[in-house]
């Protein structure tokens, strides 16, 4: 699938949309190299196939720029990838030194960086702080349609890491979506068996980055499915 780190059902929706719009999706393919040609670029895949075009967009993520900061001399431990290692209150291995943001490699989101920074500030000032809890942090992929997710995932349920039920509602069954002619997307809710407390969810829809807020609040406040449905 595209977006291998996201919910597989969400990735499938995007693949279907991409192909319907005329895009060719090469599944289970990895790029080995890219070279400039006389009139464009040629990408060679791991299986030997080649793809040619006018341009190649390199969407390979980012790497931390920590190599020349003298962190080793200060006693700040980094990982093999160069990320600064921190605990859940943003402390590094050096006493009195904190780190926050993408350089830590902890869920590379602006909102998480802000949380880490606030936690580091208050902890440095001696205040009692709650450690960073990524299970209540929502993340978004700004594709069309968008993907919003929070908490435990379908993969967690399938692997038995959490005893939960998963309910998926197609967006096409929603009255507003019908009126707007929107057929691609869904809302997936993950809740614990027995207590029915919401512990995760996925939204694939236009403006999913805004719609996920309701599920994120339910996860953070440990609301049950019935409590959410009654609002």
Stretch-by-stretch model annotation:
Residues 1-38, 42, 107-114, 122-156:
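Rossmann-like dinucleotide-binding cores of NAD(P)H-dependent redox enzymes
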Residues 3, 65-68, 80, 107, ...:
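Glycine/Thr-rich phosphate-binding loops of Rossmann-like dinucleotide-binding domains
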Residues 35-50, 56:
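Conserved beta-strand-loop-beta-strand element in the redox core of flavoprotein oxidoreductases
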Residues 27-29, 80, 168:
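Short loop/edge segments at beta-strand edges and connector loops
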Residues 125-126, 137, 142-231:
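Flexible, glycine-rich terminal cap/loop adjacent to redox cofactors
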Residues 24-25, 50, 77, 163-165:
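Conserved beta-strand segments of alpha/beta enzyme cores
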Residues 50-126:
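FAD-site-proximal beta/loop scaffold in flavoenzymes
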């Amino acid at each position: 699938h595209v977006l291998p780190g996201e919910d597989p059902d969400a990735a499938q929706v995007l693949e279907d949309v991409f192909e319907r719009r005329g895009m060719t999706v090469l599944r289970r393919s990895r790029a080995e190299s890219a070279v400039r040609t006389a009139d464009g670029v040629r990408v060679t895949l791991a299986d030997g196939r080649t793809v040619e075009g006018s341009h190649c967009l390199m969407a390979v993520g980012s790497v931390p720029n920590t190599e020349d900061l003298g962190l080793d001399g200060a006693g700040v431990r980094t990982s093999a990838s160069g990320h600064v290692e921190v605990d859940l209150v943003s402390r590094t291995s050096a006493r009195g030194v904190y780190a926050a943001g993408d350089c830590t490699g902890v869920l590379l989101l602006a909102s998480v960086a802000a949380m880490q920074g606030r936690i580091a500030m208050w902890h440095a000032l001696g205040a009692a702080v709650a450690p960073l809890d990524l299970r209540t942090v929502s993340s978004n992929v700004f594709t069309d349609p968008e993907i919003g997710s929070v908490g435990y995932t379908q993969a967690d349920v399938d692997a038995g890491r959490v005893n939960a039920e998963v309910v998926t509602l197609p967006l096409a069954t929603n009255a507003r979506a019908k009126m707007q002619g929107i057929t691609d997307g869904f809302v997936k809710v993950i809740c614990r068996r027995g207590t029915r407390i919401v512990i995760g969810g996925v939204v694939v829809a236009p403006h999913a980055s805004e719609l996920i807020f309701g599920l994120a609040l339910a996860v953070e406040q440990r609301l049950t499915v019935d409590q959410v449905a009654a609002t």
